[in-house]
């Protein structure tokens, strides 16, 4: 194994990728620092669950179509497949012999831990294992949940987003803007929620569109960023995710 394994940086809640928000750089001068290590900046759903973000991250690293998992997609009520990164992977030969360093900020922390869990269970049938990740580094990582989620409308007892909450209103405002701009905003800031069907249908009025979005299961279940960041969500994830002796954790 090379001692110059690639580094992949994963943004947090409401974060953005290198092709969004013009000159703004989520990682500051990180890519200007001289280093022999190849570095890549991922772009995953800023409002998506740790699981969905991990699936999007895996596809970007490997260069494959996003696969959220057949059982997961059926249970949560969204499409199984997402964007196709075939031929565009950061590390096409990603494997145990060519592992990566993962760096996650905020929600990026549970995202990269979830990714290693899925790799350890060969979730995508690539013949993967936990050793595809040589190190996991978290920066202000939300590893045990955050009480801030309850201020945004998560129920303190269940962790689920309340029907009338700031989070729900924010989502509707975002989607109304997306409708009004005809999707142009995706080139500026992409919420990556296409697998939930948040795409304007031909001939659909704004009222019909918002009604459909409001009825989506996205904020009614556990497959969203808000739940992933609650104490309940973190507790459930930490009960399943493991650490592995061949991986460095910081």
Task: Please annotate each region the language model reported.
Residues 1-164:
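N-terminal non-catalytic accessory region
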Residues 117, 126-250:
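Helical cap/lid subdomain of alpha/beta-hydrolase-fold lipid enzymes
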